[in-house]
């Protein structure tokens, strides 16, 4: 843990893009070297938290499920108090925390995290959602610290040109990095971890 407390990583993206899969993969990749905890956001359930518990991503006491109600982006941006309270609770429970992963509820391309809540942000999109997603931009996609283009293995089945998808992502993001990934099989996870260690100072 740094003098500023644990690194808080916000993970956002539309429903079904692979946020929970990324969270699970990051837990598995980081937990042997760092003290890790997770906060998940769901609108009316704690389904994502329960999934991570069943998957044994982390010990149960290191996972917090937040039920946001209403619009999920409000709880990570306009009024992040419910998530900030969960961060404070985890820090009180685990004095040695290095990393807190904060997974947002599924939202649209405009969703972003309050800088008060997240030090670094990852935005996940789904190749199967269509060729034009990067061209639609939106703050979450264009301004997150890292974009993860997930489910690239499905591209041949959904008529998506990966080279064009990469080109459009580069145009939308400028110099900001992105990773082509297939998180279910683990492809791209090492690149994401390397980014977090480098940019997050782990």
Swiss-Prot record:
Cellular component terms per the entry's GO annotation: cytoplasm
UniProt-annotated location(s): Cytoplasm
Name of encoding gene: ureG
Main location group: cytoplasm
Record flagged with keyword Nucleotide-binding: yes
Upper lineage: Bacteria, Pseudomonadati, Pseudomonadota, Alphaproteobacteria, Rhodobacterales
Described function: Facilitates the functional incorporation of the urease nickel metallocenter. This process requires GTP hydrolysis, probably effectuated by UreG.
Quaternary assembly: Homodimer. UreD, UreF and UreG form a complex that acts as a GTP-hydrolysis-dependent molecular chaperone, activating the urease apoprotein by helping to assemble the nickel containing metallocenter of UreC. The UreE protein probably delivers the nickel.
InterPro entries: CobW/HypB/UreG_nucleotide-bd, P-loop_NTPase, UreG
One of the GO biological process terms: urea catabolic process
Example of a GO MF term: nickel cation binding
Name of protein: Urease accessory protein UreG
Keywords on record: Chaperone, Cytoplasm, GTP-binding, Nickel insertion, Nucleotide-binding
Domain of life, per lineage: Bacteria
Family as reported in the entry's similarity comment: Belongs to the SIMIBI class G3E GTPase family. UreG subfamily.
List of residues binding GTP: 13-20
Species this protein is from: Dinoroseobacter shibae (strain DSM 16493 / NCIMB 14021 / DFL 12)
